[in-house]
Regions:
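C-terminal peripheral helix-coil segments that are non-catalytic and often amphipathic
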Residues: 1-15, 116, 120-123, 156-185, ...
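Short Lys/Arg-rich basic patches
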Residues: 15-21
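Short, leucine-enriched amphipathic alpha-helices that occur as contiguous helical runs
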Residues: 24, 28-36
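Alpha-helix N-cap/helix-initiation sites
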Residues: 46, 128-132, 176-184
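Amphipathic alpha-helical segments used for helix-helix packing
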Residues: 126-149, 153, 202-206
Length: 237
């Protein structure tokens, strides 16, 4: 074989390897998505790998190939949910921390940073097609073990940073100390006005007379959440 022939002979092999890897990743993601739903519906003990494999359109040995065990698959599900949250929230948390780094930041800038956190929470919980599956999975995990490694992982990667930024933004806006005994509860209540829409979404839509949480509906929720938050924060000064 000539030197000129070699690249042509290697290219198909590289293409096949790349295509095989892409298919493998697609299969892995499909299994994780199905497993999150099944674990959420039945819990870790009640879910069977055979059921998950069938629903994902793969044979049972495929689960062992990709995840080693049922425990490995369960952990991969938790990591997937955590990674999605980190990916979604990290940019806005970083922006909030940048505002906090400016000791001369205006009250408007501080509130806008907090409002962006509220907006991101709305988008994350109401735009996701798989929100209900993820929420059920997390609820099962919380019921399964009180000191959940999954919740500790989420808190380590995202929760602590988000919580700290939120507390400091509200504290500086209101002119109170971040260690104020009531501040943590107040911030939780500000976020709670948004989180209420994530539980029983179908029932909530029916009560509101909406067909879905579309762009118009989300814009209204964000606007009102900001208005109510600012009114409350002004009253705490």
């Amino acid at each position: 074989m000539s030197h000129d022939d070699q690249p042509a002979s290697r290219a198909p092999a590289r293409h096949r390897a790349g295509a095989s890897y892409a298919r493998g990743e697609e299969t892995r993601k499909r299994i994780v998505a199905v497993a999150i739903r099944v674990f959420g519906e039945r819990g870790f003990e009640g879910a069977s790998t055979r059921e998950i494999a069938k629903a994902a359109g793969v044979n049972a040995p495929a689960l062992q190939y990709y995840f080693d065990s049922k425990e490995g698959l369960y952990q991969a599900c938790g990591e997937h949910i955590a990674e999605l949250a980190v990916e979604h929230f990290s940019p806005v948390v970083d922006e909030a921390r940048a505002v906090l780094a400016d000791e001369h930041a205006s009250r408007d800038a501080l509130f806008e940073a907090f409002g962006a956190l509220l907006d991101t929470l709305v988008d994350h919980h109401l735009l996701s097609e798989h929100l209900d599956d993820h929420r059920l999975f997390m609820a099962q995990e919380q019921a399964r073990q009180e000191n959940s490694p999954l919740f500790e992982m989420v808190d380590r990667k995202l929760g602590a940073r988000t919580r700290d930024a939120s507390l400091q933004l509200v504290a500086r806006y209101c002119g109170i100390k971040p260690v104020d005994s009531e501040l943590r509860l107040r911030v939780m209540m500000l976020y709670g006005q948004v989180m209420g829409f994530t539980h029983g979404r179908r029932t909530m839509l029916t009560k509101l007379g909406w067909e879905k949480f579309g762009p118009r509906e989300l814009a209204m929720i964000k606007r009102l959440a900001r208005e109510q938050s600012r009114t409350l924060m002004d009253s705490w000064r």
